[in-house]
């Protein structure tokens, strides 16, 4: 019986030792879990901060994305004001027209600088992706569905349609009532 009790005490000692080891492992794992949770919370705060910073930066870019373009247009505005002032005093219409042509040329250069260009449509087949047909012109001088007149120019900004052109499109002439077809 003594042997049994010694064996039991030995087993009990081993179990206590094992229990202590397991408690230490649990303690370590709890510490790791706590540190991991702290790190996750820290990373979440960092992500939230970066999201907010990105949102602010994007808003700032939206607000000022046309700043350079607007600055370049100020020179055109100044020239228009000078032309208007000169026009009020000038007697010579040709010099006023020349000033307006210079301003128009300057404006086209600024548009070109920013990737804004006219959509060439006149004389071409009507394309609803770049133009709106606002008039029909009966004619046999052009094939049907050909743009015969640009009413308002259309523009691209890079490869995207900024504003579609408004155009008149050729349609075949209608036969007059009472005319016989022979």
Swiss-Prot record:
Coiled coil: none annotated. It comes from the Bacteria. It is found in: Cytoplasm. This is Protein GrpE. SUPFAM superfamilies: Coiled-coil domain of nucleotide exchange factor GrpE (SSF58014), Head domain of nucleotide exchange factor GrpE (SSF51064). Keywords: Chaperone, Cytoplasm, Stress response. One of its GO terms (biological process) is protein folding. One of its GO terms (cellular component) is cytoplasm. Its main location: cytoplasm. Homodimer. One of its GO terms (molecular function) is protein homodimerization activity. The lineage of its organism: Bacteria, Pseudomonadati, Aquificota, Aquificia, Aquificales. Belongs to the GrpE family. InterPro entries: GrpE, GrpE_coiled_coil, GrpE_head.
